[in-house]
Amino acid sequence: MTNLRKSHPLMKIVNNAFIDLPAPSNISSWWNFGSLLGMCLILXILTGLFLAMHYTSDTTTAFSSVAHICRDVNYGWIIRYMHANGASMFFICLYMHAGRGLYYGSYTFLETWNIGVILLLTVMATAFMGYDLPWGQMSFWGATVITNLLSAIPYIGTNLVEWIWGGFSVDKATLTRFFAFHFILPFIIMAIAMVHLLFLHETGSNNPTGISSDMDKIPFHPYYTIKDILGALLLILALMLLVLFTPDLLGDPDNYTPANPLNTPPHIKPEWYFLFAYAILRSIPNKLGGVLALAFSILILALIPLLHTSKQRSMIFRPLSQCLFWTLVADLLTLTWIGGQPVEHPYIIIGQMASIMYFLLILVLMPTAGTIENKLLKW
């Protein structure tokens, strides 16, 4: 008789994806982030479900309902902070996961990569709408500023913004629809993530060398299940240190002031994980130009497979490309820092230089480095 996990229609799918899956024998800890992202998503859906039981999406009661969750609901404070800081962990894992794909050339799996880009955009939309729900000052003004960017679209811009708002300003209708979208999107993300995994398992995982590992595969279980559990424990440790010791470290103090349309905060800024894109947006002194740069700063990821000029897949044996890759990482950290600073000298010029550098590295320098490396190797 065949083993049940190999014969049962449902168990068979799980078996082929997580148990008997042939995996490369040499994948490093950089390959842990996929499973960590799955864990972050499940954590956020579960904590979000319990938060939604007590939250009210009405402008008059939203702020107090969040305060009520933190003060009066059993363990409400820990659920709320696990949800908020879980989102930060989600983005750390996302950026690490995408960075790994960039470094080791995983983007040559076109379908998997492009679905990953769609996932990134969907997660960013979800996080943005979630940040608006507590209805503090930064929630309200963040929602106003970011949705207002769409008014830069010629001809239909203003109508589009008012349609999204459900009125002539960010108000009750906006908050209600943002809550509805914030609730449904994680389930859509889960579905897209399954398609992401489906396409990945069509080709099998990449590995640090970037060459085929068909001749040396090992079963996913127990080797990588144990490795993933270690990663999960470290992630939970980091998250709980954040939640239990400094829950507001990554938040904005302005969000503890109830939303007031008549009083603009001195520095409107999004959550830390959007600061790099916000810095690119602010570095262009033209509204439409800034919006286009903002959109392109994320969508540029979809172009990366087309910009791959090297005859080697991974960067592991390409020192020139490695230097440029880590320059890009440093540049993104610089942009993240600038995004949180006020719009004044010298931050303006630093932001503009870092924005130019970002696009220059991806569109020009990295493809050129790939060609130079081919020439140096006489390929």
UniProtKB/Swiss-Prot annotation:
Chain positions recorded as heme b b566 binding sites: 97, 196
Gene3D superfamilies registered for this protein in UniProt: Cytochrome Bc1 Complex, Chain C
GO biological process: mitochondrial electron transport, ubiquinol to cytochrome c
Chief subcellular location: mitochondrion
Cofactor(s) for this UniProt protein: heme b
CDD domains: cytochrome_b_C (cd00290), Cytochrome_b_N (cd00284)
Subunit structure: The cytochrome bc1 complex contains 11 subunits: 3 respiratory subunits (MT-CYB, CYC1 and UQCRFS1), 2 core proteins (UQCRC1 and UQCRC2) and 6 low-molecular weight proteins (UQCRH/QCR6, UQCRB/QCR7, UQCRQ/QCR8, UQCR10/QCR9, UQCR11/QCR10 and a cleavage product of UQCRFS1). This cytochrome bc1 complex then forms a dimer.
Listed name of the protein: Cytochrome b
Organism: Bison bison (American bison)
Gene from which the chain derives: MT-CYB
